[in-house]
Amino acid sequence: MKTHLATLATLAVFAAFLCPSQAAIVWTGATSTDPFDDTNWDFSGSGVSAVDANVSVADDILIANGSIEIPNLGGQQRVQIGNGFTMTLDNTTFGLVAGGNDGTGGQPGSSGVNINLINGSQFNPFFIVNAVSLDIDSTSSATFGGGGNPVNISTINLTLGSTLSFRSETPAAFTAEHLSKITVNGVPAVEGDNIEIAPFNGGSGSQITAIPEPSSAVLLGFAGLALALRRRK
């Protein structure tokens, strides 16, 4: 009996691990691409009832197979994620209307929020701010429109295959202001080691590509050589 109960407990743990919790606020895009139009959201699984500019959303957010454009409101506005919560973009484009200079982030003094880009998502804000941890999977990209400090009090983790671009930060500006905020698979970014930095947007910007570390490339080379020798036999 004890063995049977232990087995059931183990299966329950694995089931919880394999079945991630659903986001409580879900994008429907029923009316428009405006994230501040509440008719575009399904709040039925949440205690939250609105998404307003510069007001913390105290729940996880899921935007799947969608297209969002932050409207060009007065001043710089943002989709503001509540402390400790996550916004996930799944096969989604998240950007700005023409001429927009808005972004997303946490509240001032935030203890940390997460933005995850998966399944070919494109994240194109002017900036992120206030303790954002942005994670970009191997199929997704992020392009920041702003200059100055578009990655403000925030960090970015790249995966091999992901792309990070800045429209108004030259390679020199990126290196001086943002290199220390970037990791590749959790390891600090080092130019020529695990990232390459190239000019972008006619030279006024920069594009960062994650590359295999030299040790990984050597191992892949040895593996390819071993496979070729085996085939010759």
Region locations from a protein language model:
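Beta-strand-rich extracellular passenger or scaffold domains
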Residues: 24-29, 35-210
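Short, threonine-centered small-residue motifs that mark membrane-proximal processing/anchoring sites
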Residues: 12-15, 19-25, 204-222
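C-terminal membrane-anchoring or membrane-association module
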Residues: 228-233
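Bacterial N-terminal signal peptides that target proteins for export
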Residues: 1-9
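Conserved Rossmann-like nucleotide-cofactor binding loop
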Residues: 225
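Short N-terminal leader segment in a subset of presequences, especially plant chloroplast
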Residues: 9-12, 33
